[in-house]
UniProtKB/Swiss-Prot annotation:
Its main location: nucleus. GO terms for biological process: regulation of DNA-templated transcription. The gene is Znf569. This is Zinc finger protein 569. It comes from the Eukaryota. It is found in: Nucleus. GO terms for molecular function: DNA binding; zinc ion binding. May be involved in transcriptional regulation. Keywords: DNA-binding, Metal-binding, Nucleus, Repeat, Transcription, Transcription regulation, Zinc, Zinc-finger.
Length: 679
């Protein structure tokens, strides 16, 4: 390991002066020197092993003058024009001033050097080590680059040819860079530049914001930071009015409006509005991930991603929301969160006008219009519009489920499903309906629920025009037209159009019923079935008919009931043309044409076309009568028989003749009565 790669020592970050140099510093510069030296020393003893206090630190603490040293001066070739002289001329008459070699015949060019290095020169308070070359005719800037070659001049004569051989020239000029960093070897022409540079090694941040306490190593960065507090924003976008502290930020922002993407990837041709985004993108092709976390070994292609990741280990969340107090590890995350409070959506789709709070969300949305799906699965070729969707899809091939619930050990391939699942254990339902007060675990469930109240059905079937309140219902419905049943049971060969129905069916073979009723102990294969069952205990009927006020425990029952008001009968028999309001009624009716009777009694062998008919028949063998009249105690084997019996007690006669107005308690009695009018 080289010295520049190792630990920083006090020698690396110390700055020394000659007696003459110290005299050239004004009180402000001396004070800055004292502060930086003491700060560098304190930084080193804070993060490193104990140090013996150097003499210079003792003197600075006592506000005495520091030590005086001799200095070796670094030279580099002048970037100006080269003056020609005899290439075999030697430098003679070597002279030493304050440890610096000076020659009287080094070149034909008269230089003027700072009195910092030549006691007989005029004083230069700014301490610039520039010199003026009459041969070139201009003042040369100091050397700040890492790539410039530097030459230490020894205190002895040397061959001019040997010194300048790499440049193939006869008369170079030199620029002084006498202030050298002991840690990395970089040279500087001014003391203050070296002082600023040393903060890179020590982590020193001399400039502190009085508003928030944040420290900065450069004054310019502190000035820019102050503008965040003062909201001093000078550069305004003429398109949207957004303002920026820096002109460069405005220029980048305006590319959102113009669509300009000047930075193009040479590998795939993708273009970007910012050069930094192109650099990050190119790492996808190279696979380069140079930033590694020391805690867990995870690597990142961007330094900022590593910095953000490290806060996961430390738990640091320094950016807090003023509205709700929620804290974030990154200021960008806080900025996006704030738009949730303000409702700001600055990114608008040119096609449909939909607005978004994040630019990335707009890009994803635009792919809905263009149909672009740039992320393709290497296994099956399926393409996706989002990288995250591809990542999740790949888990269906690998079987990976990285999100595990600590409560029940259930694993999930989607983080979103994992978060939703955790709310089952906490019973957290943060999203409440303003109409009926019902609460939901997910916001999306609340949105779907509210469509019951509003009657909104935004998803329309292109084949028959039928509308649905949920997209999943539309997708399931469209399979009726296509006849598609992609999910086939390996046990019995039965196929299903929906994956959920297939999963539920498989539990018939396994006998799995993981959901138990706390009231009666009855078990169910689906949580939805348990939810519906619990309503039989609670009597809850949340779905109410707007026409007659009748309430139902299931939304599907309400939908069926509504057809009694509308007269809708969407299920038509292909054999005889008879229509039905329920699909199950059509299936039972079709068995009348086919003669199919799939439900057979184990006792007597009698077969039935309906499961409910077999259940009632079996009660004839067992004598079971589970439906009791609460008034007289009479029991019945069928609930329909109990319903008819109850009308004797209540006097209810719901079936009315439209001809004469006579009412009946049973529908069959009304049908028989209506024959009087027809004959």
């Amino acid at each position: 390991m080289t010295e520049s790669e190792g630990l920083v020592t006090f020698k690396d970050v110390a700055i020394d002066f000659t007696q003459e140099e110290w005299k050239q510093l004004d009180p402000t510069q001396r004070n800055l020197y004292r502060n930086v030296m003491l700060e560098n020393y304190n930084n080193l003893i804070t993060v490193g092993p104990p140090l013996t206090k150097p003499e210079v630190i003792f003197k600075l603490e006592q506000e005495e003058e520091p030590c005086v040293v001799e200095r070796e001066v670094l030279w580099r070739p002048c970037p100006g024009e080269i003056l020609g002289i005899d290439e075999h001329q030697k430098i003679q008459d070597g002279q030493v001033f304050e440890g610096i070699v000076v020659t009287s015949e080094a070149s034909e060019c008269p230089e003027e050097f700072a009195s910092t290095f030549f006691p007989n020169a005029d004083s230069i308070p700014s301490m610039h080590s520039l010199f003026e070359c009459d041969g070139v005719g201009e003042c040369l800037e100091p050397n700040f680059g890492d790539d410039d070659v530097q030459y230490p001049l020894p205190e002895e004569q040397f061959e001019y040819d040997d010194a300048m051989q790499p440049f193939h020239t006869s008369s170079p000029h030199f620029v002084l860079t006498p202030f050298k960093c002991n840690h990395c070897g970089k040279g500087f022409s001014q003391t203050l530049d070296l002082i600023r540079h040393l903060r890179v090694h020590t982590g020193g941040k001399l400039y502190e914001c009085h508003q928030c306490g944040k420290g900065f190593s450069h004054k310019e960065k502190l000035i820019n930071h102050h503008k965040l507090h003062s909201r001093e924003q000078c550069y305004e976008c003429s398109e949207c009015g957004k303002t920026f502290i820096k002109m460069s930020n405005l220029i980048r922002h305006q590319r959102i409006h113009t669509g300009e993407k000047p930075y193009v990837c040479q590998e795939c041709g993708k273009s970007f509005g910012q050069k930094s985004n192109l650099i990050d993108h190119e790492k996808i092709h190279t696979g380069e991930k140079p930033y590694k976390c020391n805690e867990c070994g995870k690597s990142f292609s961007q330094k900022q991603s590593l910095v953000a990741h490290q806060k996961v280990h430390t738990g640091e969340k320094p950016y807090a929301c003023n509205e709700c107090g929620k804290a974030f590890p990154r200021v960008a995350s806080l900025a996006l969160h704030m738009r949730g409070h303000t409702g700001e959506k600055p990114y608008k789709c040119d096609k449909c006008g939909k607005a978004f709070s994040q630019f990335s969300m707009l890009i994803i949305h635009v792919r809905v219009h263009t149909g672009e799906k740039p992320y393709e699965c290497g296994e099956c070729g399926k393409a996706f519009s989002q990288s995250s969707a591809l990542t999740v899809h790949i888990r269906s091939h690998t079987g990976e489920k990285p999100y595990e619930c600590k409560e029940c050990r259930k694993s999930f391939s989607h983080k979103k499903n994992f978060i939703t699942h955790q709310k089952i254990h906490t019973r957290e339902k943060p999203y409440g309906c303003n109409e009926c007060g019902k609460a939901f675990i997910q916001m999306s469930n609340l949105v779907r629920h509210q469509r019951i109240h509003t009657g909104e059905k935004p998803y329309l079937c292109k084949e028959c025009g039928k509308a649905f309140s949920q997209k999943s219902n539309l997708i399931a419905h469209e399979k009726i037209h296509s006849g598609e049943k992609p999910y086939e049971c390996n046990e019995c060969g039965k196929a299903f159009s929906q994956k959920q129905n297939f999963i539920t069916h498989q539990k018939v073979h396994t006998g799995e019923k993981p959901y138990d009723c706390n009231k009666c102990g009855k078990a169910f294969s689906q949580i939805a079935s348990l939810t519906l069952h619990l309503r039989s205990h609670t009597g809850e009927k949340p779905y109410e008919c707007e026409k007659c006020g009748k309430a139902f425990s299931q939304c599907s029952l309400l939908n069926l009931h509504m057809r009694s008001h509308t007269g809708e009968k969407p299920y038509v028999c292909n054999e005889c043309g008879k229509a039905f309001s329920q699909r199950t009624s059509l299936i039972v009716h079709m068995r009348g044409h086919t003669g199919e009777k799939p439900y057979e009694c184990n006792k007597c062998g009698k077969a039935f076309s309906q499961s409910s008919s077999l259940t009632i028949h079996i009660r004839g063998h067992t004598g079971e009568k589970p439906f009791d009249c609460s008034n007289c105690g009479k029991a019945f084997s069928q609930i329909s028989s109990l319903t008819l019996h109850m009308r004797k007690h209540t006097g209810e006669k719901p079936y009315v003749c439209i001809e004469c107005g006579k009412a009946f308690s049973q529908k069959s009695h009304l049908v028989r009565h209506q024959r009087i009018h027809t004959h």
